[in-house]
Design a protein with these regions (language model features):
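N-terminal targeting leader peptides, primarily classical Sec-type signal peptides for secretion
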Residues: 1-8
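Active-site nucleophile-adjacent alpha helix/oxyanion-hole segment immediately C-terminal to the catalytic cysteine
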Residues: 8-98
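Extracytoplasmic/periplasmic, Sec-exported soluble proteins
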Residues: 58, 62-67, 101-105, 123, ...
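Extracytoplasmic/secreted envelope proteins and their assembly/folding machinery
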Residues: 67-75, 85, 106, 110, ...
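Short, flexible active-site-adjacent loop segments at beta-strand->alpha-helix junctions, enriched
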Residues: 72, 147, 188
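Mid-length scaffold segments of soluble, non-membrane domains
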Residues: 104-126, 136
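Active-site-adjacent substructure of cysteine-protease-like catalytic cores
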Residues: 124-185, 221
């Protein structure tokens, strides 16, 4: 890949959903809450490399640009080069992948990563073990969550709580087996660099997107 910002072919995937993962926009359906898969015991207390990943964190520059910011974090980690959130915003806006008024459609999260040559998989109904295995393999993870539940866990008990935010999962800390933590780069809060949440709180916030995640990795050389 050369040094141009975006050098892969244009993507032709059409928008298939009107659901959004941004502030104030309601996702119309709630996902089934799968049981938290049992983890047989990681070789390391912390899965992933949160110390390296949190170097790329910053606050999102626009109210609804969380998914763009998370894709910037991931691209910088995997490609070992810097990107500008504003340049990514402009590129996404020109292709209708981002709307400043409503954010990023769930089907468009990851398209910026594909545009810079990364491999992307989008999945729903994942488990925390799926995330842990991806992190252990050096892959990067973006999840759709409800940010209000992350801040006020009791809100998970209210009906109609939907996904409205994107975060990067940068690690899972099993050093206390009775109280594992999920480590995030959350671009929407000032203390979001490497912020830690109890696993059960994260799962409640994550289930509002049907446990949706984008898994990104470098493409293997031909």
């Amino acid at each position: 890949m050369n040094n141009e910002l975006f050098d892969s072919p244009e993507l032709s995937q059409e928008l298939t959903s009107a659901e959004y993962l941004e502030d104030g926009v309601i996702r119309e359906k709630l996902g089934v809450d799968p049981e938290i898969a049992e983890w047989d015991g990681p070789e390391e207390a912390v899965i992933g490399n949160p110390e390296e990943a949190d170097d790329h964190w910053h606050l999102q520059s626009e109210r609804n640009s969380c998914a763009v910011a998370c894709q910037e974090f991931v691209a910088e980690q995997l490609l070992e080069r810097e990107f500008s959130e504003q340049e990514l915003i402009d590129y996404a806006k020109a292709r209708d992948w981002y709307d400043p008024a409503s954010g990023t459609s769930i089907t468009d999260i990851g398209k910026l990563l594909e545009a810079v040559g990364l491999r992307v998989e989008r999945s729903e109904h994942l488990t925390v073990s799926d995330l842990a295995m991806s992190l252990a393999e050096g892959e990067k993870v973006i999840c759709g969550v409800n940010n209000m539940i992350l801040q006020e866990p009791a809100l998970a008990d209210l009906p109609g709580i939907n996904a409205n935010h994107a975060v990067e999962v940068i690690g899972i800390d099993y050093s206390d087996p009775g109280n594992p933590k999920v480590i995030l780069n959350d671009p929407g809060v000032e203390n979001g660099r490497g912020i830690r949440h109890n696993l059960d709180v994260f799962m409640d916030a994550w289930k509002t997107s049907d446990h949706f995640a984008v898994i990104a990795s470098r493409r293997e050389a031909a």
